[in-house]
């Protein structure tokens, strides 16, 4: 710690005598801190919830059937002949406050079950990021649109989240990110879908929780190809993008590169040759070995051309016999045919402009205002998990992550505070099960859980030692603090 000057000592004494908080500069002078940059906001605390509440099963959807003694052949499989799950992990749709859910998953008995599945390999969250919104929601039913108001639990949650604007939102997400980080497998990763109004702040929060070195990408999703809203009097460029922050827990991140199909322009430019035998398009790739002997490349003569090659002589012969080695018209160089059908496509970058938001006529559309397209989640799930892995979404909304995870053969945990979100997700997942069954594919059972009888009173701060009538009065006061009673 650096030595204080006499003036600094006197200043500290004056602040203490006046019972005033010390300016930040004295905190850094008095207490050693190796961090070069620190993120501070009103009400910041390092305390993290460690409450463990019991999960209660509300409903088991497609409960696995008991095996019959004569069905010995089925005992070697997790699924019966119709694809229905018989044993193993049951997916979980949880109703309640995600902070208490995360804390109970991390510190409770379900943690051991999660670890047996290899831990959480992927978390995707799309938290409500509209600062100042009242979080009512327009719902489409047939040709009509209705406005769904937040229930008392949602109102309290949203008021606590946005009551102080960005400060309270950051405090909310900070604690939950710490809990999510601790639940992730060592090779796990997290994607945060964030709006432009808070993305710059949340990136700083993620840097603090995961470390800036674990920031892999800031993905820009161009969700709309619509024109800007200048015609309506806007004085800004059209806002058609959202950010998706991609972080890993460690340097051992699980990763599967993703590709998109080549455009017609790339195909006509790069794959301009047509094979005379198969009619397949191909391009010519070099087979010479740059660096020669220094790179360990072999030297030999092939088809009258001497040189350093990237393939062994026996491998070159195999390719030639397969019709893939081509001698140039000058007879001085060799190339290899690379067929379009064998190409993976164009590697996906951090600009996603090929995945539009859900259109009004889409079959995916559920009338849920913040619903994301399945193709978006499919790309994320395929990139950062493998079949059979466990993934999660702790702001599940309409349940897109669970629906796509089920179709891709992943296990899942999702939760939401909103009752409508739970109902929407439940109905959607039953539809996915029916679809998979009709296609002859495997599907898992899922259970709907909450955090036990007293989770809601615990969450909204009702004293459980009060008599029932007093608890009801307390609940009214919490929901309407200005109402006399």
Give the positions of each predicted feature.
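Conserved S-adenosyl-L-methionine
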Residues: 60, 373-448
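Phosphate/ATP-binding catalytic cores across multiple sugar-kinase/actin-like superfamilies
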Residues: 105-108, 176-177, 319-347, 351, ...
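Conserved proline-anchored active-site loop of SAM-dependent methyltransferases
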Residues: 118-137, 206, 391-405, 415
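Single conserved hydrophobic/aromatic residue that forms the stacking wall/gate
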Residues: 476-485
